[in-house]
Amino acid sequence: MYAQAAIKPNTLLRNGAYGIVMRGVQKCTCAGASLRGRNSAPLCCINLDTATDPACGTAGFLVSASEYIRNKYEDTMTPEQWDHFGGEMFTGFDTDRTMLRISAMNLMLHSIGNPDVDYRDSVSKQNQIRGKYTVCLANPPFKGTVDAGSINDDLKAVTDTKKTELLFLALFLRMMKTGGRCACIVPDGVLFGSSKAHKSLRKELVENHQLRAVISMPSGVFKPYAGVSTAVLIFTKTGAGGTENVWFYDMKADGFSLDDKRSEIEENDIPDIIERFHNLERESTRQRTEQSFFVPKQEIADNNYDLSINKYKEVEYIPVEYPPTSEILADIERLNREIETEVQELKKLLEMGKSDL
């Protein structure tokens, strides 16, 4: 039933009402709204039971997750599973009613017949959800702050801050069941920030849960809307630790140019990232000079839980051999003689010109 409900969702999105709405949205500036990098979303799509995006925007991540499930399991899903797929499997929250309407339309056009998207300030005391979801896929607001009095006390216990990018990470941990998996996009500052709130949040992920991967992305992936450098954090909620080695990947290209035009290009690291992430046992021999490698938990702890790849990446410098000093000086003297000869010839030509006058 649901398999036939959206035969060509891409065509609908491109030419239908949703495409028109999205083109309009791209021109507006809704406070705190973040238009998702759709090309990055497949990194976050894993086998799902119940998924949430507490800052869903246009529901780009949830749609990508639904497409992943359709492509992989469509032929084997039971009617009960399709009912679950079209109903309670995907949940989103946002504080912008326009975005909620768009996200509902987006999900319905992708076979989610009863999208569960609600108006809710996810990091406020209003949100009391805990231990409910098995997967969290999110791109929370960057560089924002919220009123200190409205922040849920549970979140402040993990990271005492007003910064949304930190509060949402603490929120993901609270909203997921034990064993739940999260893939979220964060600004680079989360990885190396030196404040107490930054360090305590990173320590929470590394020491009390299982941080699996840090995928650094180039700064242009969100252009023309934002030029901030970002990364994908992938972790599992355990409440009992589990981090042994963290996998780092330095993404150079995502299939699109990194300027404001974001034109398609051949270079694309995303297929390589997905392949390597699903075969991490092969990564143990990778060197720090390569594009991806493991870093032991203890080394991360010794570096104040810094999660920036540049902290651990080794740059292989190729030595440059220069000629002897005597040879360089001889070349300089030769060039000076050539210049002097040319100057003298130029003077002669100028003198000849004067005599002709």
Predicted features by range, described:
Residues 24-25, 29-30, 45, 176:
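Hydrophobic beta-strand core residues of beta-sandwich domains
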Residues 124-357:
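A conserved structural/catalytic subdomain of Rossmann-like adenosyl-cofactor enzymes
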Residues 1-26:
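Long recognition/docking surfaces used for binding and targeting
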Residues 8, 26-27, 31, 37, ...:
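Intrinsic disorder/low-complexity segments
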